[in-house]
C-alpha cells in the first residue's frame, strides 16, 4: 500500500496542512508537507487527539435516533385536501461488551488467588521449618543422651570386665527407649500433616470468598451498563450540549409535575382523583412525549453569498441569525469557534447549508482567473529548446562589470560596438554553440523578488570572485541566494593575470560555504578567467552552455507571451518603460499586457541595443512602452485578449495591494504590540539594536532579554556597534521589527528605506528610558510618550578660537532651523559624542534666536571645545505625543 503524504492526509480529514503539521508536532512527530505518514504515526496522532479531547474511553452502549419526515395528503372539509407532515422517530440501542474490563477482572482474580496460595504456602513452609528445627533439636538431645548412656555402660563393663551384658533389666530399658522414640516421631509427622491440611483449607476458603465477591462486582457492573446510556459523540462540547438539552427537558417535566401536584394539594376527593390521574399519565407516557400546540413559524431560506473568507459575525449577519446560533451549530459539528474567528469558504458553506440556507460562492479573483484562462497557446504543448538565462553576481570591485564588458565587446557584432544601454540590465549574446541571455542586475534586489514570486527567471548563477581578494560578504550573500533559489552555481575566478592570485585560497574559502570544485570532489564548475586579457572567457561560456544542456531548458515558442519584469523606470519623454524577459510564447507589438498592478497596449518595442523590433521570443529581453504606470521588478507580465478586462484586473490588484499595505502598517510596533496578543501563543517583539560602544550594547541586550515573560518574548534579531544602515532597515522591515538606536543615527539610505517600509525607528540616549518604555509596551499600559523631534541640523565647516567662548564652530544649516533655546547633540560619523546646550548663536557678529536652512552661523557649545570640521550639530526638542491603543 502506498504511503500517504501529510498534504494528502490533510485533504482527506478536511484540515489545513499547517494545522495538521502543528498537531503532528504536538504529538511528538516532526513532519513536513511532502513527508509520508505511516499507519503507526496515524495511530499515534489519533491517540494524542483522543487524549486531548477526552476520547480515551470508548462508549460501551450508544443510542442512535433517526427521524424521518413525510407529507400525507388528507381530504378536508368541502372536498379540499391539505398536507399533513408525519414525523417518525426510531431509536436503536447498541451495546458493546468491554473486553478490557473482563480481562482486567480476570487478571485481578488470578493475581489475588496466586497471592493467597503463596501466602498459605509460605506459612506452611515456615511452620514445617520450625517443626523440623525442633525435631532436629530433640534428636540431637536424644543422641547425646544415648552416647552418654553408651559411655557409662562401656565404663561399667570395663570396671566389672564383663564382655556382654545379658541382664533382663538392660534389655527392657533399651526396648522402652526405642518405643518412646518411635511414638515421638509418629506424633510429629501427624502434627505436620494436620497443619498442612489446615493451611490448604484456609487458602481454598479465601479463594472461594474472593471469587464470590468478584462475581458480585461483575454482576453489578453489567447491571449498571444495562441501564446506562452513552452518546455516540465523543466530543466534550457536544456531550455537554446534549446533557444541557436533557436537563432542560427534565426541568420542563419537573415543572409540569409540580404544577399537577400543586393542583392536587387542595384536598378532598378531587385531590385523590388528581393524584390517580397523574400517576396514570406517568405510567402511560413520559412527560417529554406530551402533545402541545405551537404557533407554526415558516422557516426563511436565504441566498447567502459567501466570499473566500468570512468571520462568524459576518456569516451570522448574512443569514440574519444570532452569532450564538452559528457557534452552537459549529459545536454540534465538532468545532469550537469564537465570534471573530475567520472561516474558510468550504466551512462556511457547510454551516449555512446545515442551517437550511442556499449558498452562492463568490470568487473574489474570478475575473482575474477568467482573463488568464482565456489565454490560448496556439502552439499547444509543443516545447522547443530556449537559451539559458544567466545572472552575474559578485562582490564590489571583483571584476563583474569588466567581465560583462569583455563578453559584450567580443560577442556583439562590429556594427553594434556601441554596446548596450546599461540601465536596461539584460542582454543576449550569440556564440558558436548557441545564445546566452545575461541579467546585469546591480545587487540582488531583482533576483530576490523573482525568487520570492516563484518566477524562476534565472536558470544559472555565475559567481565572480577575485583571485587576489577571495570570499567577501556579498559573495556569501550571493551563495545564499543561489542555494535558496535552487539554481546551479558556476564560479568564475577573475583577475588571474595578477601575481597575487591565489586559486587554492579561493577554493578553500568557498568550500567553507558549501561550494566545492569538481577537482575537490564537488559538483560546482570553476572557470579561471581574466576580464582584462580575455583568458578563459570562452571556457566560461562553454561551461554555461554545457550546464544549460544538462538542465534541458525548453519553452513554448508560439502563442501568447508571458514573462517577468527585470527593470522599470519612468522616462521623461517616453513615459513608463519596462524591461521584460520573455519566458514563453512570442511578445508582439500591439499586444495587451497585464503587468502586475499596471496594464496597457504595447506601443513600441526595443531590444538591448536600442533598435526597434516587432516581436521577441523566449529568453529575449525587450523594452516595452505603453503601460499605464511603472511596474515593480519581479512582477509577472502576461498577454491577454481584452483591454477592458485587463484594466478591471489591474484595478482589482491595486485595491488588494492597498489592503495589504494597510495591513503591513499594523506590524509589530510598540503602540499595538500588546493588542496583537489575541491568542494564547507566545508573541515575539523583534528588535534591531545598534549602539555607540560595545559595553552599552551588551548592557542593553542583557536588560531587554531579562524582560521576557511567559506571554511576551523579546527577540533581538540583529545587534551591532555603529550607525543604522540600509541593511538594518531592510532586515527590520522583513522581520516586522522595531529599530532602536542608542546614541547612533540612521544614514540617508536607511532613512529612505525606513520611510518607505513604515518601520518603527526609535532613538535613545539613556538606557533606563529604553528599558522602561519597552517594559511599558509589553505590559500594555503605555504612559504618554515624550518624543525627541529633530528640528535642525548644521554641518561644521570651520572652527575658530574665541578668548571668551573657546571653540566657535562655523556652520552651515543644512536642515530645519537652529534655535538658541533648544538642546543639541554633536555627531561625528553619525555617532553621538556630546549632548548639551548652545552657549551662543551668532550671525554676522549679531546674537540671533534662530537660524534657518541654507544660512551660515557661528555656534558656541557650552562646556565643550572638541568641535572638529565635518562634525554635525543636531538641534532637537522634546514634544509630548498622545499615545493611543
UniProtKB/Swiss-Prot annotation:
Residues 530-532 are annotated as: G5. One of the essential components for the initiation of protein synthesis. Protects formylmethionyl-tRNA from spontaneous hydrolysis and promotes its binding to the 30S ribosomal subunits. Also involved in the hydrolysis of GTP during the formation of the 70S ribosomal complex. This is Translation initiation factor IF-2. HAMAP family: IF_2_B (MF_00100_B). Residues 385-554 form the tr-type G domain. It comes from Shewanella oneidensis (strain ATCC 700550 / JCM 31522 / CIP 106686 / LMG 19005 / NCIMB 14063 / MR-1). Belongs to the TRAFAC class translation factor GTPase superfamily. Classic translation factor GTPase family. IF-2 subfamily. The keyword RNA-binding does not apply. It is found in: Cytoplasm.
